[in-house]
Regions:
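Cofactor-binding active-site loop characterized by glycine-rich and histidine/acidic residues
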Residues: 62-63, 68-80, 84-96, 101-243, ...
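Glycine- and acidic
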Residues: 15-18, 65-73, 91-100, 124-130, ...
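A structural-propensity feature for long, helix-poor, extended segments
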Residues: 221-222, 228, 603-624, 629
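Thiamine diphosphate
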Residues: 6, 162-185, 191, 205-216, ...
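Non-catalytic terminal/interface segments that mediate subunit docking, oligomerization
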Residues: 58, 62-84, 105, 120-123, ...
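Generic, well-ordered alpha-helical scaffold segments in large soluble proteins
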Residues: 15, 19, 34-38, 79-86, ...
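N-terminal amphipathic, basic-rich helices that act as targeting or association modules
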Residues: 1-149, 414, 486-502, 506, ...
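Beta-strand segments within the central parallel beta-sheet cores of soluble alpha/beta enzyme folds
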Residues: 125-135, 156-162, 212-222, 249-252, ...
Length: 882
């Protein structure tokens, strides 16, 4: 765009500069906004840029001054760098397959060091403590610092990634493996950022509801620029902006590289991220250039240096740091004679030392200081660094991420660059270096952390205990529904409605729904509990005149997440780990379409287990034939199998309201009173039927996973044992009647709320017996239940056959027939679907007769008679294939 009147242009610029000098940024911002509004009303389309020039956001004149001892901190930071590198290399000398990462921490050491020295607040009596999501691949640096602090021994460093024998260090942040050290698992790319957002949001929730004091704690999330391509990394940033989460700080290590090559070789990742975050209403703080560039910026009166910085793409910037100062002079400054003139007095070595912002402690401190003091917005810090910084041959190379070994020449260069006191003769031994106790370095480390409340990272393992109301509180569920038909989903809603009335536990219950509350019949809670909103309710809801109107409230208890399963699960994790992060045990209930649970957010569910989260996941509208009208994408037949892959997840598929009540009460007791590091997955259905009263003595069997529901004590020549769960148990009950009435065969009916728990018990017993060959073998719970029973065993569920197949090895009878809903779902009536998937009462009878025929107890023709009697088509297509 050509400047047609330079004099007028300068007058406008001088006027703006005068306003900035005399009246400040706010006034200048106001005037520019008004001018933009005027132009817009006049129909003028003004140029609009959501990004700023490729330079630091904070000008030199506005930088907060770092108060500490720069030279001492560089000394300590260098030792941390060395020990991190030595730890990874020594582990790979022991076993080359152990792996490890050097380059990520090498690029981010300064980013962490400034945080540890000045910003990461540890929990104290006066301060709840900051929550820090460390970038997973940078864990060696965190261990190395903890070693200097005396928290981790040299033996532990030696055992990096060697955990089986004990006293080792986990590869990445894993609370399950190091429960007093790591707070959050982060190395599955993208899960750290989305969890950090919802931890910050849940912190505001706890503040609004009076559980924790307001405004003290921060959530820090460290991540890489390549990680930002994960949908979870950026998918929830609009929520953070909308909720004005000024307790949240993202620090993105922009070393411009991912595993295979550049993040945006043909563009600029920092500029791209600036636009994305600024558009989501974040405070964006770019830290691109270090302080050695400041004199050159001061000379850049015509803007040519800035223009050159703006036009160079990331692939070229990576090249500059993979080469040397002469290359930078030729290819960066050599683009214009004026730029070459600007650096004519600088040697190639001095040009090489022109540093990037993420390696400059002064620039990083200024950015962090601005972030913690910024109000009304979350902050993202985009810090430009060099991958593999200081590692010599691996620095800024495409192979940097996979570097686990450094040659002797590079080690020597690393030692010299960072002034490590290791002799040439000892270099290949890679000795750890730790200053003596009482040294200046040790004192400085201790003083910096003491000023911030103690060492980090640290994780609280136990919290205050909260009593859980007795089972009798849920008496209405235990006594049955009389003649009224209700679903287990409705029973669940009634259980929660009762529990929230308890003075101790009630306020700590956190109902979480992804825009499906009305589907599950929970809209009555809108008015009762309120929906959490950081601003309350600024409008009059359209249904205000109704009893169950949509009520938003700053102190609302329900988290209504919208159509957002990953966000809802992240909220659940935040609530489920609140006992550790805030010493406030909360009990979250996240209810969702069971098909859109583990199948959709399985990685987050795995992270929940690693995080030792407590709470209930409720798979609503479960069962492949029970949610009959929704079809293939909605009908769940495998969520229990997916849940079974998480070791500390307890899963149940109850049929009746009393089973559900017993399970929820016992789970609450285990997680809230005993603080066991487990969580529960329970499926509930939308099929209405009469809910019976609980049989006497059923509680123990419900929790263990199996109990005798109906015993056929009548005389019969032949007998079978029928197992079922969920709504299909009712088909099993009907099958028992058909066997008796149509064939004179007796049948005991067993309710099996959890085949997964039966498998867990069986495996534990099997292992014990293997390890104690000289002692009397123990029996699994399945064997205890079925050991003295007559006849073959038949199981039918609304899930894949593999679900009930899990217990086959402990079933005493050789004849164990399993029915299940393998195959794609489809829409139709429940009756037709259950026949299609071969799990209804007639198919249960058929399987029972087949098992008896296999034993020789009855003739095969009886099976054929049943096929004809019930109109079963022998040539029917296999549901697995159609």
């Amino acid at each position: 765009m050509q400047d047609l009147d330079p004099v007028e242009t300068q007058e406008w610029l001088d006027a703006l500069e005068s306003v900035l000098d005399r009246e400040g940024e706010d006034r200048a911002h106001y005037l520019m906004t008004r001018m933009g509004e005027l132009a817009s009303r006049s129909g003028t389309q003004l140029p609009y840029a959501i990004t700023t020039p490729y330079r630091n956001t904070i000008p030199v004149t506005h930088e907060a001054r770092m108060p500490g001892d720069l030279f001492m901190e560089r000394r300590i930071r260098s030792l941390v760098r060395w020990n991190a590198l030595a730890m990874v290399m020594r582990a790979n000398k022991h076993d080359p397959d152990l792996g490890g990462h050097i380059s990520t921490f090498a690029s981010s050491a300064t980013l962490y060091d400034i945080g540890f020295n000045y910003f990461f607040q540890a929990p104290t009596d006066e301060h709840g403590g900051d929550l820090v999501f460390f970038q997973g691949h940078a864990s060696p640096g965190v261990y190395a610092r903890a070693f200097l602090e005396g928290r981790i021994s040299e033996e532990q460093l030696e055992n990096f990634r060697q955990e089986v024998d004990g006293n080792g260090l986990s590869s990445y942040p894993h609370p399950w493996l190091m429960p007093d050290f790591w707070q959050f698992p982060t190395v599955s790319m993208g899960l750290g950022p989305i969890q950090a957002i919802y931890q910050a949001r849940f912190m505001k929730y706890l503040e609004s509801r009076g559980f924790i004091p307001a405004g003290k704690q921060k959530v820090w999330c460290f991540m890489g620029d390549g990680e930002c391509d994960e949908p979870e990394s950026l998918g929830a940033i609009s929520l953070a902006g909308r909720e004005k989460l000024d307790n949240l700080i993202f620090v993105i290590n922009c070393n411009l590289q991912r595993l295979d090559g550049p993040v945006r070789g043909n563009a600029k990742i920092i500029q791209e991220l600036e636009g994305v975050f600024r558009g989501a209403e974040w405070n964006v703080n770019k830290v691109i250039w270090g302080r050695f560039w400041d004199p050159l910026f001061a000379k850049d009166t015509d803007g040519l240096l800035q223009q050159r910085m703006d036009e160079v793409i990331d692939g070229e910037y990576q090249n500059y740091k993979a080469k040397d100062g002469a290359y930078v002079r030729e290819h960066f400054f050599g683009a214009r004679p004026e730029l070459l003139e600007m650096v004519k007095d600088l040697s190639d070595e001095e040009i090489w030392k022109l540093n990037r912002g993420g390696h400059d402690p002064y620039k990083v401190y200024a950015a962090y200081h601005q972030a913690v003091n910024h109000k009304g917005q979350p902050t993202v810090i985009l810090a430009k660094t060099i991958k593999g910084y200081g590692t010599g041959s691996g620095e800024a190379k495409n192979i940097a991420h996979n570097v686990k070994k450094v040659d002797v020449d590079s080690l020597r260069a690393f030692r010299d660059k960072f002034d490590i006191p290791v002799k040439d003769a000892d270099l290949e031994k890679l000795p750890f270096y730790k200053p003596e106790e009482g040294s200046a370095e040790a004192k400085y480390l201790a003083e910096r952390r003491a000023a911030l409340g103690g060492f980090m990272p640290v994780r609280r393992q136990k919290s205050m205990s909260v009593p859980v109301p007795p089972l009798e509180t849920l008496k209405a569920m235990l006594d049955g529904s009389g003649d009224r038909e209700i679903s287990t989903t409705m029973a669940f809603v009634r259980i929660i409605s009762q529990l929230v009335k308890d003075k101790e536990l009630g306020p700590r219950i956190v109902p979480i729904v992804p825009d499906e509350a009305r589907t599950f019949g929970m809209e009555g809670m809108f008015r009762q509990l309120g929906i959490y909103s950081s601003v309350g309710q600024l409008y009059e809801p359209v249904d205000k005149d109704q009893v169950m109107f949509y009520r938003e409230d700053k102190k609302g208890q329900i988290l209504e997440e919208g159509i957002n399963e990953a966000g809802a699960m992240s909220s659940w994790i935040a609530a489920g780990t609140s006992y550790s992060t805030h010493n406030q045990p909360m009990l979250p209930f996240y209810i969702f379409y069971s098909m859109f649970g583990f199948q959709r957010i399985g990685d987050l569910a795995w992270a929940a287990g690693d995080s030792r989260a407590h709470g209930f996941l409720i798979g609503g509208t479960a069962g492949r034939t029970t949610l009959n009208g929704e079809g293939l994408q909605h009908e769940d037949g495998h969520s229990h199998l997916l849940a079974s892959t998480i070791p500390n997840c307890r899963t149940y598929d109850p049929t009746y309201a009393y089973e559900l009540a017993v399970i929820i009460r016992e789970g609450s007791r285990q997680m809230i009173e005993e603080q066991q590091d487990i969580f529960y997955y329970i499926t509930v259905m939308n099929e209405n039927y009469v809910q019976p009263a609980m049989p006497k003595g059923a509680e123990e069997g419900i929790i263990k996973g199996m109990y005798l529901l109906e015993e056929d004590k009548k005389e019969a020549a032949h007998h079978v044992q029928l197992l079922g769960s969920g709504t299909i148990l009712r088909e099993v009950e009907e099958a028992a009647k058909l066997l008796r009435n149509d064939f004179g065969i007796g049948a005991d009916v067993w309710s099996v709320p959890s085949f997964n728990e039966l498998r867990r018990d069986g495996l534990a017993v099997e292992r014990w017996n293997r390890l104690h060959p000289g002692q009397k073998p123990k029996q699994s719970y399945v064997e205890e239940c079925l050991g003295g029973r007559r006849g073959p065993v038949i199981a039918s569920t609304d899930y894949m056959k593999l679900y009930a197949e899990q217990i086959r090895q402990w079933v005493p009878s050789k004849e164990y027939k399993v029915l299940g809903t393998d195959g794609f779902g489809r829409s139709d009536s429940r009756k037709k679907l259950r026949n299609f998937f071969e799990v209804d009462r007639h198919w249960v009878v058929l399987a029972a007769l087949e098992a008896l025929a296999d034993r020789g107890d009855i003739e095969p023709k009886v099976v054929a008679e049943a096929i004809a009697k019930y109109g079963i088509d022998p040539e029917k297509r296999n549901p697995l294939d159609c």
